[in-house]
C-alpha cells in the first residue's frame, strides 16, 4: 500500500473516531436514517456550523457506504473577507481528507434583494457543477431553525397551503434532487458537531443585520419563546400541513388523469 493510501486510511480512521462521542454518534445515526441514499452525491458548504456539520456527517456516511462524494464551497464575494474564508474552509476540510472545490460568484453585485439574488446565483453555480460531474443529488444544510423561520416568512407573505408546508426534505429543480437531511436537527446540535470536529466555523455578520427579513423573523421567534412558544408543536403543525398538501396534490393529479381518461373515451364514442 502506498504512503498516500496509508495516510488516507489513517485520516478516515480519525474521522470515524469522532463518532465515538456519544452525542455525535446519536446525531450521525439520525443523519443516516434521514439520508438513506445509495448513489453518489454532492454537498454544499458555506463554512457556517450547519454546513460544516453536514460536511462531516456526509463524509463519514460516504466512507461507511463506499459512495463517491463531492464538496462545493460557494464564495459569493459579497464581503471582502469571503475569499479568504472560503480558502480557510477548503484547508480545514482537507485536514480530514475532504477534498472540495470553491465556486465563485464573479461580476457586479446587486444593491437590492441581495440575499434573494445571491441564493439564485448559488444554486446556478451548484447545479452547473453537479451536471458537470453527472451528480443527481445535492445535500443542503437547512435545519429545524430554518424550517421555523421559513414558515413565518411564508405567513408574512400570505402564502397558501403549499407555501406554509415550508421546506421539503427533498424536492427537484433542474433535474437535481435537493436533499435536506438536517431538517430534524437543532442548530445547537450542528454547532456542537462543528466545534467538536473542526473547532471552527464562520459567523456571517449578515445573520445579525436587521435589514434582512429572515433576521427580523429570527428575532421575532426568540421573543415568542419568552411567551411559551413551543417549537415541537410548530414542527407538528408544519408536518400536518405538509401531509395535507401532499394529499391534496395527489387528488389533483388523480382528478386530472380521470378527466383526461373520460375525455378520451368521449372522443372515441364521437
Sequence positions of predicted segments:
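Core alpha/beta nucleotide-donor-binding catalytic domains of modification enzymes
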Residues: 2-220
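ATP/NTP-dependent adenylation/nucleotidyl-transfer catalytic domains that generate, transfer
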Residues: 173, 211-270
